[in-house]
């Protein structure tokens, strides 16, 4: 009996040791799961987008004669499938490098005297989790690891950094230092994402807090979506979005809500001279449909159910699930409605109208027009503080103001 108890004890100790063993290593370092939530011990994460353009959030200049380690590393997270993580060059004409995302996969574009190439590789990384990335120059070769696994090895693509004819290199985060037209395959530079623990050829990036380079959405729990903080807006030309059906004339759109807070403008149809022909406002967890001086209709809002707006020749219908409110076209001067689509300044706007004071913030899971998903990158103009592919999990003081 004692022998059986002793054997059982040994097995339990062996099992405990196995459970306590460190995980497999990559080049002597333990691989670790990166939690998507920033901990108090981590350095502040940097938001990678400066708005809809290609301007980087920061630019570093590194002296190549003082590099001790040809090695860079960082962690990033995003729900955005396309954009620039970082760009580097010694000159914009014939020696530049880009690491970004396209369709959620990493993509390298490289242009120099030794090689000109574009390569996409690895799994999709637009999953909202932190992913560690490492790059190392080894002579004329570039090696890249993601999540502790070697993903890419490119040989004979460059001179070694020690033999480089140029003495300095620029590294830009979240943007480009050359026109997008000069890329081998153009992409949308703006990336709604965050980067942290970044070391660039032995140099740690320092980013001072400012209205344009704040922590943004890097210090909150995120979910995928399209987030409009208070006071932000996006405007689409009616000529650039899917057109109404002709016979019978109908136009429809659908908004999927994940989060709603505050009161203010949600959506408007109008022109440059009249931005309020048809309005939907958020007010006390309800949506209010109105048109100029006509009577308003109110629909209680259920977050999680799509909100649908349908227009035809005789009515405007606002519905959500089984609930429905109707504005009769006899009150709305139907000719004005049809002329919106032929007017050169006819537009559809989301969020606060320019110059309007609004406390409304909302997260959209989807935005459909005429049965087609509308991308925020199609907007004629938009506020730089819109989160294009992420939303906070819940409203908070941090997200009631812009980046």
UniProtKB/Swiss-Prot annotation:
Pfam families: Laminin_G_1
Residues carrying covalently attached carbohydrate according to the record: 274, 284, 397
Disulfide bond sites: 194-218, 363-391
Record-linked InterPro entries: ConA-like_dom_sf, GAS-SHBG-PROS, Laminin_G
Domain of life: Eukaryota
GO cellular component: extracellular region
Annotated Laminin G-like domain residues: 46-218, 225-391
Signal peptide start and end residues: 1-30
Keywords per UniProt: Disulfide bond, Glycoprotein, Lipid-binding, Repeat, Secreted, Signal, Steroid-binding
Subcellular location: Secreted
Any GO molecular function: steroid binding
Entry function: Functions as an androgen transport protein, but may also be involved in receptor mediated processes. Each dimer binds one molecule of steroid. Specific for 5-alpha-dihydrotestosterone, testosterone, and 17-beta-estradiol. Regulates the plasma metabolic clearance rate of steroid hormones by controlling their plasma concentration.
PANTHER family, alphabetized: LAMININ G-LIKE DOMAIN-CONTAINING PROTEIN (PTHR24040), SEX HORMONE-BINDING GLOBULIN (PTHR24040:SF3)
Subunit structure: Homodimer.
This protein's name: Sex hormone-binding globulin
Gene name per UniProt: Shbg
